[in-house]
Design a protein with these regions (language model features):
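Bacterial N-terminal signal peptides that target proteins for export
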Residues: 1-8
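Bacterial signal peptide processing site
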Residues: 20-22
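Metallo-beta-lactamase
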Residues: 26-27, 31, 35-37, 42, 74-75, 82-83, 168-171, 175-239, ...
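Divalent metal-coordination and catalytic microenvironments
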Residues: 46, 69, 79, 94, ...
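Active-site metal-binding motif and surrounding structural segment of the metallo-beta-lactamase
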Residues: 73-76, 85-128
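Conserved beta-strand hairpin/beta-sheet module of binuclear metal-dependent hydrolase folds
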Residues: 43-89, 177-191
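C-terminal motif of bacterial Sec signal peptides marking the signal peptidase cleavage site
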Residues: 15-18
Length: 261
């Protein structure tokens, strides 16, 4: 009887693991929209990465990621596309193809790959939210500033679910925040988080000395992340946090990979 019970428990355990793995693997990422200036890739049932391209003199079109979180025909967006033209295109696609309501836009820091298309969102009467320091820095640099500020963190409802935007400290900039979607254990790290094998990138507004500790704070707060989306490059899992922590703890020689402001 003991042997039979052990076999039964083993079968049940294997079945549970198999079901879990199947659930994790059942959604295959797919490109759902593409034009010359904008791409949208669905990565889960509720989340999409929007990628627009920042034209530079030396590096051509630099791809820049943002995140769309959806539930019950509502969306909240982290980071605008890089300019108003690509932002117009994204807003039109969400409204006319998804038929979803855009409840808000959250730029994760003050650079143009986060709020370069903010004018378009405001023209469409979409409210914008940002960390207080982001608004201050946007105004200092004569950029269009987000409308609504938060001191440390912000919780917003999207459909029946909740998203969090929060500052964990300085890194890529003084004002960088991350976005977290608890129901899918998904983190939008923006330019604070690097894709695997990336170099340090643009450091003109960075605090390199504390970058690693800031990401360590994120890792401690969200220990069960399944997906992590960086501001540039390929998304992955929590391994991107470890890579970023290591990158800014040690010296890495060689030419830095370009990352836009």
């Amino acid at each position: 009887m003991k042997v039979g019970r052990t076999i039964l428990l083993t079968i049940l355990a294997v079945s549970l693991i198999t079901c879990k793995n199947s659930k994790e693997e059942e959604f295959k990422p797919k490109l759902v929209y593409e034009s010359a200036i904008l791409q949208v890739t669905q990565i889960t049932e509720n989340c999409f990465i929007h990628t627009s391209f920042l034209q530079t003199n030396d590096f051509g079109n630099v791809p820049c990621n943002g995140l769309i979180v959806s539930d019950s025909k509502e969306v909240i967006i982290f980071d605008t596309p890089v300019n108003d033209k690509s932002a117009d295109e994204l807003i039109k696609w969400i409204k006319e193809t998804l038929h979803y309501k855009i409840k808000g836009i959250i730029p994760t820091h003050f650079h143009d790959d986060c709020l370069g298309g903010l004018k378009s969102f405001h023209a469409n009467k979409i409210p914008s939210y940002a960390y207080l320091k982001t608004i201050e820095l946007a105004k200092e640099n004569n950029f269009i500033a987000p409308q609504n500020s938060f001191n440390d963190s912000l919780l917003l409802k999207v459909g029946d679910k909740t998203i969090l935007a929060k500052s964990f400290g300085e890194g890529h900039t003084k004002d960088n925040v991350v976005g977290y979607f608890p129901s899918e254990e998904l983190l939008f790290g923006g330019c604070l988080i690097k894709e695997l094998d990336a170099t340090k990138g643009y450091l003109g507004d960075a605090n390199v000395a504390v970058w690693s500790s800031t990401v360590e704070n994120i890792k401690k707060r969200f220990p069960n992340l399944t997906l992590v989306v960086p501001g540039h490059g390929k998304y992955g899992n929590a391994e991107l946090l470890d890579y970023t922590i290591d990158l800014f703890k040690t010296k890495h020689f060689g030419e830095d990979k370009f990352e836009s402001k």
